[in-house]
Every structure is written in C-alpha cells, then in structure tokens.
Amino acid sequence: MAVDNEKKRSTPDSLNSPHAKKSKPMQELSESGPLTQADVVYFQKEAIWRQMIQYKQQMMSMRSELIRLQRESDASKHIVTVLTAWYEQILALFDELNSEETSDLLLAITKNDDEQLDLIRKKLSNLISSKVTFDSAKYEKVSGELALLSRQNEQMTEEKRSLGERIDELESKITELAKEHERAQSKTLKRLDSQRHIKTEEDEQSTTKEENPQPNGHHKENDKTAVVDSEELDNLKCELDKLKTANQLLVQQVEQLTKENQSLIQKSLNLENKLHNLEESDLEDNTYYKKIVKNNQSLQEQIGKLTKLNSSNVSRLNELERQQNDLKSVIEGEIIEENEKLKQQLQESENNLVRIRTTRDELLSKNNILTSQLQDQKTNESLVELNNVLSKRVESLTEERLEAIVGTPGTGKLEDLSQQELIHKISQLNNEIKEVELAFKQTREITLKKLTSSIDQENLTKKLTIEKNKADQKYFSAMRVKDSLTNENKLLKAQIAKSQDLIKNLNDLEKKYLNKIDLLSNQLVDFRIIKENSLAENSKLHDELKTLNIAQDALHQEVERVNAKLESTLKEHTDLQESNKKRELELAKLQKQLQSTENILQKYKTNNTNSLLQEDEQQLEALRSIAKCSVCSKNWKDTAITVCGHVFCSKCTQERLAARLRRCPSCNRGFSANDLLSIHL
C-alpha cells in the first residue's frame, strides 16, 4: 500500500521531470566492497517492504475469516427464522396464549440476553409439557442419551480447545517461518552473511600463516597470549563443569520422575480395580450414597401418605357431589311444583276477570239505554208544557192588545161607529195582527233556537254524564281489579319471599359446599404439587444416579486417559534419554569447538593488526548507521515514513509532528501522522 501511495504521489513529479524514465536512486544493492549509504537505504526499504507484506497477509487472513463468519451468521439467521416459524406453528396449534404473550415468546435476533432466553425456554417447556404426554421409559432413555451426548460434547469442546491452541501455535510458527524465509531471501542479509564468511575465512588464513615457526624475538609475545588463553580456557572449563553438574541434576530429576510415575501407575491401577469392583461397603461409607438412600426412603413414605390422603379426599369429594346433586334435584322439583300452582291460579283469576268484565259491559250498556230513554221522555213533556204556556201567553197578550185598542167589545159601540171607522179599525187590527204575528214568529224562532241549544246542552250533559258514569264504572272496576291484583300480588310476594328465603338458604349451603370444595381442591392441588415434587425429586435422584454412573464412566475414561498419558510420559522419558544422549554428543562437539575457538583466539590475538580493527570499526559504524536514527544518533530506528521510505526513531518523528515540521529530514518530503509505520529492523 505504501509503495502504491508512493507511486500515486510521484506521478506529477515524474510527468514534469525530463528524466522520468530513469530508474529511481537507492533501489539497487552494490555487489562488492563495504556497505554504502545507498545500501543502508535499500536495507531500510526492504525491511519496510517485508513488514508491509506481513500486514497484507494478516489483512487477507482477517478478510477470509470475516467472510467465513458472515456465512456462519447468515446460516444461523436462517436457522433462527426457521425455528421462530416452528415456534409460531406450535403456539398456533396449542392456542393457549394471547397475541401479546406469543410476541414476547418469539425470539429476537438483535439481542440475546441469557436471562430472557431462559424465561422464554421455561414458558415454552411448560406449554409443551402441558400438551405432550410423559413417558418415563422414553424419558430415562433420552436422558441417558443426553447425558452421554453432553459428556461427548464436553470431550469434543476440550479437544477443540486444545486443537485451537495447537492451531494458534502452528500459525505463529508459520508466521515466524515465513519471516525467516523472507529474511533469508533478502539480498542485504545475504550480502552481510557473505561478508561475515569472507572475514572468517580471511582470519583463518591469517592465523594459519602466523602459526608457522617464528624467530626467538617473538617468544615473549607468545607467552603473554598463552597466559590470556589459559585464563580463558580455565573459564571455559568452569562453564563445562557447570554444564556437567546441571546434566547430572537433570538425570537425577528424570529418575525421580520415573519413580513417581511408576508409583502413580500402580495407584491408578489399584483405583481402576476398585472402580470396576465396587462393593456395598465402599458405597455405604460414601455420604452422597447415604443421602440418596435416606431421601429415597423419605420420598417413598411421603408418597404412601399422599396416596392415602388422595384416596380419602376423592371419596369425600364424591360424597359431597352426590349430596349436592340430591339437594339440587329436590329444590328444583319443589320450585317447579310451586311455579305450576301459581300459573294455574293466574289462569283462573284471568278467566274470572274476563267474565266479570263482559257482564259489567253488558249492564252498563243497558243502563245507558234506559237512562237515555227516560231523559227523552222528560224532554218531550217539558216541551209540551212550554208550548202550552206559550200558547196561553199569546192568547192573553192578544186579548190585552185588543182591549187596549178597541176596548171591550160591545154591540152598541160597533153599531155607533161608521163604516170608514170600522174599516180603519179593521185595518189597524190587521196591521197589529201582522205585527203580533211577526213578533210571535220572532219569539217562536228565538224560543226554538233556545230550545235547540238547550236540547244540545242536555244531550251534551247526557253524553258527558254517560261517559262519566262509564269512567266511574271503569274506575271502580279498575279499583276492584287493582284490589284483587294487590291481594294476589301480596300473596305472590309472600310466596316469592318464601322461595327467596329458600333460595338464600340454598345459596348459603351451596357457598359452604363450594368453599369446602375449593378447600378440598386446593388441598388436592397441594397434594398434586407435593406428588409432582416427589416425582421430580425421584427423577432428580435417578438423574443423580445416572450422573454418578456417567461420572464412573468418565472416571474409567480418565483412567484410560491417564494410562495413555503414562504411555506418552514413558515415550517422553525415552525421548528425554535420547535427547540426553544427543546433548552428551553436543557437549563433545562443543568441547571440540572450544578447542578450535581457543586456537582461533590465539591466532586472532597474535595477528590483531590495525587494518583489521579499522575494517571492523567501519563495518560496525555502518551497521550502527543502519540501525540508529540519523537525526539524533541515539535511539534505534523503529518508525518509517511511508511517503518516501526513510526510517527514523519514533521520538524524532513525534517531536517533528509536535513542532509542525512535517517534512522528512533527509529528502524534505511532506508527511502526516497517518504516514508513519512502526517496524523492527
């Protein structure tokens, strides 16, 4: 990535420069001679390139791991969706929860709290256990298989963990080998190694030349070097003695370990024999076995007591239900009889009422007809009397008028009168008669009008009186009916009160019986809970026994593992013996190497010329210039600038960033904090 960035950033410079096609400086290693500054820069760039390749490999491995994890997460999401659909189908089949509860029970993919999952698991297990029938034989079989599978799962997890650790170790070894391989392929390191070999060969050649016989003048110098070499030889012999003593100690430790191993093997064999041939005495001494036996006995006693109580409670409940059914049948029969009697009485009273009403209406109609006839007769008589009175009054009025006009009639007066006077009086009488007739007609019309109005009023009064009589009769009949109904209502209320008292008494009895039934049902529930608890404890004890058996099997397997480990330790012991032999051989080789080194030291001390020292100092300074910072010349180079490839210490780069001098000290190229890369030379 740094090289790509360098290429991208160098494009505008390369376009503007006239010599763009030329190779970049400091990218070729010198083949011969001492190391130059260009070789140092090449070495730095090569180290940065190796580090970048390592980062790239890590990134590729992380990317492949991320793709694998994404696939696994997609598969797990698919499985979770399928399981949620199954749970929805199960809940729909059971149909015992509301929609809110089912939404709480369904799994959420975003969050997976262990407590919430345990609650959901318990709810679903209760639902499924309420619907699914329990088979003890299948349960025992499945529980045994589950225990075996759990044990196998634990073994597999342990093996997986150990394999994972081995894989991590192998990955670390592979990375180290890859680093060593890359370092072995680097040109600079090959160059340095070749220079070292050349120097050693030159030193050996010089020592062989100087080993030839010299004149007596150099005898004193050889004596001095021999004294120094003898001192170094003594030191090396002391170190050899130390190594021998350490080797003897290691041999003694190995012998002790073998003895302990043999004793452990014997103990393990004895324990294995005991485990295969367990006796009752061994189990009786065990506290867990005693507890299990005591718990089993107490549970059996509790189960016997609970069965007796359950049978007695069932018999009592049956008796109470029978008594309750008898009482209900008796009360229902009495209530039905009373209702039938009341219905008969109501029908008879209704029939009597209808009959009385019909007779009453007939009598009222007859009475009205008779009263109307009597009133008509009275009106006719009164009219006749009025007519007579009026005729008499008219006659009296005519006579009075004639007397006033003519006077009392007499023959002498009429005779004395002349004809004209008689005609005149007759005309006056005719006029008066006409006026009297008009007045009579008017009075007759007025009287007739008054008569008609009086007749109408009388008819209205008659109608009103008739209607009043009818209303009075209806009122009185209604009052009579009301009195009869009130009496009947009182009787019915008294009967209803009696029936209500009976119903209250029956309700009280029913409440008492229901309370007793509730108490008995609660006791039954408690007994069932106790029974379930006892069964659960019994199953737990069975499970504990199974777990003990499983533990026994696990112990057998552990014994087998211990035997396998013992075999492996024996193999390791043999390997250690072989390694000790190899070390002894290596010690012999080291002794030979010591002798050769002593000879080399003597030769080197005799031929320690100034020229070789100067060359060594130059090489050391060159290596120091490679490894130490060129700015401060104190700290080791550990950070590289990815823009230009130059390497400095982290302190100098951080000081430059803090002082805002963000340019490379060697090439004056700009950089930022993101362009820094930590390396190890």
Swiss-Prot record:
The name this protein goes by in its record: E3 ubiquitin-protein ligase BRE1
Enzyme class name: transferase
Pfam families per UniProt: BRE1 (PF08647), zf-C3HC4_2 (PF13923)
Database matches in InterPro entries: E3_ubiquit_lig_Bre1 (IPR013956), Znf_RING (IPR001841), Znf_RING/FYVE/PHD (IPR013083)
Cell location: Nucleus
Coiled-coil parts of chain: 50-77, 136-190, 224-446, 477-628
Classification of source organism: Eukaryota, Fungi, Dikarya, Ascomycota, Saccharomycotina
GO biological process: cellular response to starvation; filamentous growth; filamentous growth of a population of unicellular organisms in response to biotic stimulus; filamentous growth of a population of unicellular organisms in response to starvation; hyphal growth; protein ubiquitination
Comp. bias (Basic and acidic residues): 1-11
Known EC number: 2.3.2.27
